[in-house]
Each structure stands twice: as C-alpha cells, then as structure tokens.
Amino acid sequence: MFIGIVSLFPEMFRAITDYGVTGRAVKNGLLNIQSWSPRDFTHDRHRTVDDRPYGGGPGMLMMVQPLRDAIHAAKAAAGEGAKVIYLSPQGRKLDQAGVSELATNQKLILVCGRYEGVDERVIQTEIDEEWSIGDYVLSGGELPAMTLIDSVARFIPGVLGHEASAIEDSFADGLLDCPHYTRPEVLEGMEVPPVLLSGNHAEIRRWRLKQSLGRTWLRRPELLENLALTEEQARLLAEFKTEHAQQQHKHDGMA
C-alpha cells in the first residue's frame, strides 16, 4: 500500500515509519510511506508557505501554490488512482467502518493542514475527501494522519502477526472488545475466569461474545442501536444484563 504525506513536519511521521506494527510493515515492504513538504516547493528565500486571510481575522492560512505543487508531486509518485484526503475538523468522522472503507484503496495521499487551515481553493480542486478524528482542535493534521495510517495499516495482509487480530479488534464487528487475560493465573486475589482455562473453545467463544456485548452495553450503548443483533447475541446480552444486575445487587447489599 502506498501512502503519500504532504506536511510541513514530515519528520513527525518517524513515529509511524520507525516503530511498532507500522514500522515493521514499512520494513517488510508492505507499506510504502513517502512525504513531501510544501516548503520544498516555494520560490522565495524565506520559503514562505502561509499568508494572511482575506477579510481579516486571526492566524494565517497555508498558501495555494506550495501546497498544491506538493500535492501534485505526491500524485505523480503515486500514479493513477490515488485518493487525496485532507485531515480536517469539517470532515467525516473516522470510525472502524470508515477505516475499513479507506483500506480498500491501494494509494492514499494525506494532506496535513497547519495554522488556521488551507485556502479553500485547494480543497475544491485537489481534495477528494475530508476526514476528521474527532470534534476537538489540534495544531495540525499530522496526528490525525498518523491515526489514520495506523488504523488502515492493520487491514493490510501480513501486517499483523495474527490475521484474526484485525477481525477481533474493538469495533471490528461494531462492538467493544472483550476482556483479555495472561499469566499469572491469580493476581492479588483476582483470578482469570475459569472458562478461559477450560479448553472448551465453544464456551470460550460464547463467553467472549457475551462480554463484548455487555461491555458495549455498559460503556457505549449507542453502538448497539445501529446493530441488528442475532438471536444468540440478544440472548447473551440478556444473560449479561441479568448477571450484572445480580452483581450490583450483591455489591449494594455489602455496602
């Protein structure tokens, strides 16, 4: 997969190219990340990339020419079929469904804004889609771009050590992940649930699904509103709710 980055701070992306899952993907040739800085496409000695906005107001805007030329260079390197994305608070909010959708593209170009944003004409002429990682303000598009890269890379075959990992991640099926445990079996009186030690894979799958449903109901109930639960899922969720109510009643009685 090819990902081009247009950013005033391309060195920030070493966090992606040099470390962890994405770093291994780059090293193994599964992920090709290249970057272009608009400063390299300026024509004045100060390498100016920003200017005051027409109409006044605080802050500066990224200028058209250096940014557009950097995008064109990234497009030329990517070849035909590259989708150009601008990381923007005005964009579609990134979720697991969106990540899965973006992962179907073999070529992405991510444009990172700075200052108060970019000239609207760049968006009109060069950008295919705008994406946001949340309703809050950041200093630039680099961190959102890194978030997008990390999440999309998990869908590239061979990137994860276990192919089931991406499937079993939180949100992969619209639910939060279930609890996980490793050694020791007992920690300060807290024991691993016996079913996980049973070796009964059918019961383990059932327990994990019940916990995933229950955790979603407790922490992100709005996610369940968009799901059409199967008969098994509905039954397991009902069981979880009953067990949770019993635990709460027991806890209240001990208080």
From Swiss-Prot:
Record EC number: 2.1.1.228
Top-level taxon of origin: Bacteria
UniProt-listed SUPFAM superfamilies: alpha/beta knot
Family per similarity comment: Belongs to the RNA methyltransferase TrmD family.
Gene3D superfamilies: 3.40.1280.10, tRNA(m1g37)methyltransferase, domain 2
GO BP terms: tRNA N1-guanine methylation
Function: Specifically methylates guanosine-37 in various tRNAs.
InterPro entries listed in its UniProt record: Alpha/beta_knot_MTases (IPR029028), tRNA_m1G_MeTrfase_C_sf (IPR023148), tRNA_m1G_MeTrfase_TrmD (IPR002649), tRNA_m1G_MTases_N (IPR029026), tRNA_MeTrfase_TRMD/TRM10 (IPR016009)
Assembly with partners or alone: Homodimer.
Signal peptide segment: none
Annotated localization: Cytoplasm
Catalysed reaction, written as an equation: guanosine(37) in tRNA + S-adenosyl-L-methionine = N(1)-methylguanosine(37) in tRNA + S-adenosyl-L-homocysteine + H(+)
Annotated source species: Salmonella paratyphi C (strain RKS4594)
Entry GO CC: cytosol
Protein name: tRNA (guanine-N(1)-)-methyltransferase
GO MF annotation terms: tRNA (guanine(37)-N1)-methyltransferase activity
Binding site for S-adenosyl-L-methionine: G113, I133, G134, D135, Y136, V137, L138
Keywords linked to the UniProt accession: Cytoplasm, Methyltransferase, S-adenosyl-L-methionine, Transferase, tRNA processing
